Design a protein with these regions (language model features):
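Peripheral, non-AAA+ core regions of ATP-driven protein-machinery
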Residues: 1-207, 211-214, 320, 460-461, ...
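Walker B catalytic acidic pair
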Residues: 289, 295-296, 307
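Basic, amphipathic alpha-helical bundle interface domains used for macromolecular binding and assembly
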Residues: 35, 41-46, 61, 68-78, ...
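Catalytic P-loop NTPase motifs of RecA-like helicase/translocase cores
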Residues: 102, 294-301, 344
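P-loop NTPase nucleotide-binding/switch module
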Residues: 161-198, 202, 229-284
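Short loop/turn elements that form and flank the Walker-type P-loop nucleotide-binding site
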Residues: 60-63, 120-122, 140, 201-203, ...
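Walker A/P-loop
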Residues: 208-249, 314
């Protein structure tokens, strides 16, 4: 008897349909034969399935079983094929009308893109491990059945057990509950808050430079609280990435808050961009639609920082290896923080820098010029005074800042309506900058003078215009005057030749 079961495999952050074809041969060597480019984990499924059958009172046939995993040119990895192979064997041996060794079904990564693919293929029902049921149920149009064990699956297929479909409304689609960290708790730092508001409004990359204890990390961790809420499409895409990476816990809802990823400065290149023997998304993709925070930026390896150049420019990352090439989305806002020098107190208002001559310049030199050019806002963070710390007055709450940011985002979405892949000012191409960033003669003269005095690159010229466009959007102005240009130039601190000398 021949049976075909529909299963799925992950490719990047999407899924592909894998047909599990089981045939009971009338003659030939007894046993189970797996074909179709399985890896070692898939080949070992025979022993796991045999053990599960024995512990659930099921039987393997005493004939030759050939299991083909199609398409043959796609490498099949992991233990996620155990259930469809087992169900295929049961159907082929007429024991039903599809992992632990006791038959328990364990959760697998990437179930959300598999559910999306099942809907695209016209499948109406999906049987998954019960810990994955809430994750898969967010996909409308597919009935998701969560089974706890192989035995429970068999009983359901035989009609001996009823399992209610998983519901996304109560178990998955959670409302955003607000952020515990609020800008209202930050004393002083009005200039830095203003710069972070601009960054949030236009999707601009940020570098904060200041002494230890000046509040750089505290400010960065509050940035997600002023970002616009995730749209449904963004939430689904973000959740797919975390699903493929195995970061979605049991009974977790659709990710409703923008990601905030803060990898350690000892992180490897693979940890940052993704890859590995079985490819998984890295930190730049896990931060998609959110914030990638790199604290102590110069302490990261030079080769690690240089791989950021592609995702910062293209909003995606391509991981190529000998056996595969996958592409992951990586549309994040980079927020970096660093001390101004090795001792940390260069330009400090009260403490003296103890670094030898030239040390500050060499320290900043750990960050390459091309990477620095891709950072729109350079923010100097100074320590808060004792008077500001002792003040009982609270700062402006994140909710108020967020309302201004959301309005600016709406202006940008209307501006770029119909332009594929562009919805913030930071995403504009050079041609779009010329079209959407008109400046008057006085503002142009100011910008040209700054370019000459600061020896700025052509990329920095465009980034100043993008930031100025965002400043004008926050003010509700269509044209860009001298004030937005002057403020945007002020955020190019590290471009000044005098810095660090």
């Amino acid at each position: 008897m021949f049976v075909r079961i529909a299963a799925g495999a992950v490719a990047g952050i999407d899924a592909v349909t894998v047909s599990v074809e089981v045939n009971v041969a009338a003659a030939g060597q007894l046993g189970l034969f797996l074909v179709g480019l399985p890896d070692n984990a898939v080949k070992e499924s025979e022993q796991r399935i045999r053990s599960a059958f024995e512990n659930t009172g099921l039987r393997m046939t005493g004939k030759k079983l050939v299991v083909n995993l199609a398409p043959a040119d796609l490498r099949k990895e992991g233990a996620g094929f155990d259930l469809p192979i087992a169900v295929g064997i049961l159907a082929a041996t007429e024991q039903v009308p599809a992992e632990a060794l006791d038959g328990t079904l364990k959760p697998v990564r990437g179930i959300l893109p598999m559910a999306v693919k099942a809907r695209e293929e016209g499948l109406r029902r999906l049987i998954v491990p019960c810990d994955n049921a809430c994750e898969a149920a967010v996909v409308e149009g597919v009935e998701v059945i969560g089974a706890a064990s192989l035995g429970e699956t068999v009983e359901y297929l035989r009609g001996d057990r009823t399992i209610a479909p998983a519901a996304a409304s109560a178990a998955f689609a959670e409302e955003e509950g607000g952020y515990a960290e609020d800008f209202a708790d930050v004393k002083g730092q009005a200039a830095v808050k203003r710069a972070l508001e601009i960054a949030a409004a236009g999707g601009h990359n940020v570098l904060m430079i200041g002494a230890p204890g000046s509040g750089k990390t505290m400010l960065a961790r509050r940035l997600p609280s002023i970002l616009p809420p995730l749209t449904l499409d963004e939430a689904l895409e973000t959740t797919k990435i975390h699903s493929v990476a195995g970061k979605i816990g049991a009974h977790r809802g659709l990710l409703a808050e923008r990601p905030f990823r803060a990898p350690h400065h000892l992180s490897s290149q693979v940890a940052l961009i993704g890859g590995g023997q079985s490819p998984r998304p890295g930190e730049v993709s896990l931060a998609h639609n959110g914030i990638l925070f790199l604290d102590e930026l110069p302490e990261f390896g030079r080769n690690v920082l240089e791989v950021l150049r592609q995702p910062l420019e293209e909003r995606r990352i391509t991981v190529s290896r000998a056996r595969y090439s996958v592409e992951y989305p990586a549309n994040f806002t980079l927020v970096a923080a660093m001390n101004p020098c090795p001792c940390g107190y260069y330009n400090h208002p009260t403490r003296e820098c103890t670094c030898p001559p030239g040390a500050v310049h060499r320290y900043l030199g750990r960050i390459s010029g091309p990477l620095m050019d891709r950072i729109d806002l350079h923010i100097e963070v100074t320590p808060v005074s004792i008077q500001e710390m002792a003040s009982a007055e609270r700062g402006e709450p994140s909710a108020a800042i967020r309302r201004r940011v959301v309005r600016a985002h709406e202006v940008q979405r209307n501006r770029f309506r119909g332009v594929a892949g562009v919805y913030t000012n930071a995403m504009m191409t050079g041609r779009m900058v010329r079209e959407y960033c008109p400046i008057d003669a006085e503002a142009r003269t100011l910008l040209e003078r700054a370019m000459e005095r600061l020896s700025l690159s052509a990329r920095a010229y465009d980034r100043i215009l993008k930031v100025a466009r965002t400043i004008a959007d926050l003010a509700g102005d269509e044209r860009i005057g001298t004030a937005p240009i002057a403020e945007a130039i002020g955020y190019r601190s590290l471009d000044r030749e005098s810095w660090g000398r």
